[in-house]
Amino acid sequence: MTFVRQILRNHDIKPVKRLGQCFLADFSVMKKIVELAEIKEDETIVEIGSGLGLMTSLMAERAAWVHAVEIDGKLVSVLKERLKEYHNVTVIHGDILKYDFLTALGENSVKKIKIIGNIPYSISSPILFHILDHRKQISTAVLMMQKEVADRLCAVPGTKAYGIPTVLFGLYARISRELTVAPGCFYPKPEVTSTVVKMLIPEEPLYWVENDALFFRLVKAAFAQRRKTLLNNMKNAHWKDCDAGRIENLLRDMGAGEKIRAEELSIQQFAALCNSLSYS
């Protein structure tokens, strides 16, 4: 903790609240996060929000290449100074939401990358869906996030936390909770507990779907209003190519009644419903 404060003081930097800057200051947690990524010497890592570069250096000692993405210009200057001895680190001043992961693939002739990062709580959902959009370029993601966000990713059907993120990420990745990180591990202390989540993204979805775009569309429509039944939400979606009668018949064929809500349907059932819609 003292070390982090000292670096900030030496560079006359104060954490920027609007960027959600809370610097991880526990070295044991940093080491565990990097170990969870199981970095091999021929792999490329993209780090989200490299901050002061403390965890970046741990990655650089293991990986072939590290792309350290940081939006704060002052921190970029710190990173370039602190990491200048690592010739396998590229410091990128930019917004991760605008970062093209194909850049990391193209420069280093690799097929897949790994992602490590402490996601700012205020933009956790946009970052997660940016990762999901680029899933074909990513093999593993080890991400620290607000506990409530991790709860939604790892939820089971029938619970309040089960929703759109659960189903969409659950189709494409094996997700596991790995660490709980207390507020005292950061400077300044956040008001919430953090969780480190590991995502393993295989070549193919965990459940086969005929049409990815239709799956996204279906899931988002199904959860539009949680208190309504899935059937009513689909009616309100006004799909020209999908009338309520078809949905009702398909749900009945799956053994799910017309009163079922979206949060009661498993990821596998969503995939089956999507495929039935594709072929019916």
From Swiss-Prot:
- Where can this protein be found? Cytoplasm
Q: Which Enzyme Commission numbers does its entry carry?
A: 2.1.1.182
Catalysed reaction(s) here are: adenosine(1518)/adenosine(1519) in 16S rRNA + 4 S-adenosyl-L-methionine = N(6)-dimethyladenosine(1518)/N(6)-dimethyladenosine(1519) in 16S rRNA + 4 S-adenosyl-L-homocysteine + 4 H(+)
Under Pfam families, the record lists: RrnaAD
> Which top EC class is given?
transferase
InterPro entries, per this entry?
KsgA/Erm, rRNA_Ade_diMease-like_C, rRNA_Ade_Mease_Trfase_CS, rRNA_Ade_methylase_Trfase_N, rRNA_adenine_dimethylase, SAM-dependent_MTases_sf
Q: What is this protein called?
A: Ribosomal RNA small subunit methyltransferase A
Q: Which organism is it from?
A: Syntrophus aciditrophicus (strain SB)
